């Protein structure tokens, strides 16, 4: 009887462990001087954008970049490698050296949505992303939403309210470090 109970316990423990491993979800953690923003991905709605963001984060691409555009009542934007340098005139113009095709979906651009920045060309997204701090329905169907903030909107609010210049670039650098972890 003891052997049966022990075997049953081992099977139950193994099943629970396997279930936990299989159901582990990858999230992004954006670390700033104000705290952390945790992001859940929409892999079912924008798989290419999610993979691109994760790949860039895992390579350290975002580390040392800044939030270079902050507009109160709208969004915070980052992910430009040009922001690692001191020439503020180039902020907002950089990318990874390639573009990805838009994956517009039915996700509304409500507070906390993570979306991909782009130029006039819908298929010009690369590395720059933004977090919406106020519902912005005018973006729906025009920008690829690929995640949402799980925790850390208070951090995003601090970032968006930072003093900024006429180009909406914060006066003081708000650097980020981005990592992808299992949750």
Predicted regions, residues:
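Positively charged n-region of N-terminal signal peptides that target proteins for export
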Residues: 1-7
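Cyclophilin-like peptidyl-prolyl cis-trans isomerases
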Residues: 7, 12-183
